[in-house]
Amino acid sequence: MSAARSKRPRTTNDTPPIWEGVPGSLHGSAPSTQNHEVQESSDDSTPHTLLHTEGLKKVYDGRAVVNGVDIEVKAGEIVGLLGPNGAGKTTTFYMIVGLVRPNGGKVMFDGNDATEQPMFKRARLGMGYLPQEESIFRRLTVKENILAVMETQSYTKREREEQCQQLMEKFGIDHVADNLALTLSGGEKRRLTIARSLVTEPKLLMLDEPFSGVDPIAVSEIQDIIRMLRRAGLAILITDHNVRETLNIVDRAYLIYEGQVRRHGTKDFLVNDPESRRLYLGEDFTM
């Protein structure tokens, strides 16, 4: 989705690319993110609701695997979708992305009814999607991977080179710029995938199993990236079976069980909530 063709004219007066607003980098200048907590804003302004669903429903073989799911994601926050296998969280996620068509309900994105829109049109609205499966070009270099996506945008050659270098530096992959993507580690591939996704300047980034198949150090790096993107104002929706890694980074999460949202709240609420433990986390769950 991130490479959907969407030519957008640029001028020297345009707003800078979203990644220019990402504070720090993976070269060590990012602020510490240990013991991350949701901070209450002292500003009276209410964050813009970028995504919300209304009564999403999906029926397979006469059974409602998703039955009336309402969620919302505001600009500048990280939201998780949690639940056991078969609960409906992945189907909900795919209905939002556009991979699965709902039998009922709505997907509203940035004031637009996206329910019937194909993925490429959702991408043009600003909905970015990073699939669990590897989506990079394995036989292109890191630099070529990013430049290939930039070809779909209205950059000059000089702008492409400058922005590509900036992205690689921001995500700590400039040292492997000329390496084939197939030679990268799991963490480097994830960073390249996220860097490519920002070329189209999404408003919402949907991450499908971002912590799957990477080692603990890479998980920490990916969490740092996600927090950096949050501080830049992106909205982020995550679904992942790695519960601790997900809860450690979200501002809040929805627990989906038997096709419905059964619990919703911050990490601290869900971890200490008896019903969340009974349905999904388990009585002995600790962070």
Question: Positions of the model-derived regions?
Answer:
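Conserved ABC transporter NBD signature motif
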Residues: 105-113, 125, 163
